[in-house]
């Protein structure tokens, strides 16, 4: 969250998508022994509402679907990597070129810049 705060303080726009929020809720409400945060429903909702207050949601649209389909075919995307392709499709449709992610290697196949959050803090 420090890296997001740094971007916001610098005046950089920071966005989220339904995909980001659903992945957050999945991890937030998953039990700790199962690699989750173990948040209650109420705590997860509170954190989601904080995100909504500070960041801008990028909407899904038929154009996002078309771009996602193009990407998964062009890059032969398989399995859970289709979720990364959906993020990139949303970015492409909305003209966004950079993504903040701990999994930078998952985005190397795409024509975007993947930035690790820790790189903004050094």
Protein language model features and the residues they cover:
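Short acidic, glycine/proline-enriched helix-loop-strand junctions
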Residues: 47-65, 69, 75-76, 107-122
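Short, hydrophobic secondary-structure boundary micro-motifs
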Residues: 17, 37, 57-61
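Active-site neighborhoods of divalent-metal-dependent phosphate/nucleic-acid chemistry enzymes
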Residues: 31, 56-104
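Short, well-structured N-terminal submotif of metal-dependent ribonuclease cores
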Residues: 1-16, 31-43, 105, 109, ...
């Amino acid at each position: 969250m420090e890296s997001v705060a740094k971007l916001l303080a610098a005046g950089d726009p920071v966005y989220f998508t339904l995909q980001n929020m659903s992945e957050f809720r999945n991890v937030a409400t998953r039990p700790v022994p199962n690699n989750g945060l173990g948040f209650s429903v109420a705590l997860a909702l509170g954190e989601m509402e904080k995100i909504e207050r500070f960041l801008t949601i990028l909407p899904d649209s038929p154009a996002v679907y078309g771009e996602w389909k193009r990407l998964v075919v062009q890059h032969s995307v398989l399995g859970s990597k289709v979720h990364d392709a959906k993020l990139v499709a949303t970015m492409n449709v909305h003209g966004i070129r950079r993504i903040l992610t701990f999994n930078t290697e998952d985005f190397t196949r795409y024509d975007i810049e993947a930035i690790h959050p820790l790189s903004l803090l050094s």
